[in-house]
Structures are given as C-alpha cells and as structure tokens.
From Swiss-Prot:
Tissue expression profile of the protein: Expressed by the skin glands. Expression levels in inguinal glands and granular glands are virtually the same.
Annotated region described as Disordered, given as residue ranges: 27-61
The keyword Signal appears for this protein: yes
Signal peptide location: 1-22
Function, in words: Induces contraction of rat ileum smooth muscle (EC(50)=2.73 uM) but has no activity towards rat smooth muscle from tail artery, urinary bladder or uterus. Binds to both bradykinin receptor B1 (BDKRB1) and B2 (BDKRB2); the effect via BDKRB1 is stronger.
Molecular function terms, GO-annotated: toxin activity
Gene Ontology biological process: defense response
Protein name (database record): [Val1,Thr6]-bradykinyl-Val,Asp
A cellular component term, taken from the record's GO annotations: extracellular region
Keywords: Amphibian defense peptide, Bradykinin receptor impairing toxin, Cleavage on pair of basic residues, G-protein coupled receptor impairing toxin, Secreted, Signal, Toxin
UniProt keyword Transcription present: no
Amino acid sequence: MAFLKKSLFLVLFLGVVSLSFCEEEEREEHEEEKREAEAAESAENLISKRVPPGFTPFRVD
C-alpha cells in the first residue's frame, strides 16, 4: 500500500511540474507575440507620422 501511495504522489508531482512548464512556455509565447504586435504597431505609427495629415500624393482638383 505504501508503494502505491509513493507512486501516486510521484505521478501527481511530475504531472504538476510538467503542467507548470507548459504554462510557462505558453506565457513566454504570449509575451513574445505581444512584443511583436507592439513593434509592428510602432512601425505603423512612425510611417503615419512622416506624412502630414490630409496629404494625398494623387490629389486631383
């Protein structure tokens, strides 16, 4: 009986450890995606700041 208890605790412990590693990897991936999105957004903002508002290069009067 003691052997089964130890085995069960070992399995549960290893399951919890592997679950925490998976959650950590998911969190890192999410943070990386967030950083990439912010970088893309800042690049778009830089492009839009270069052109004055209301400027259209192909304006026909």
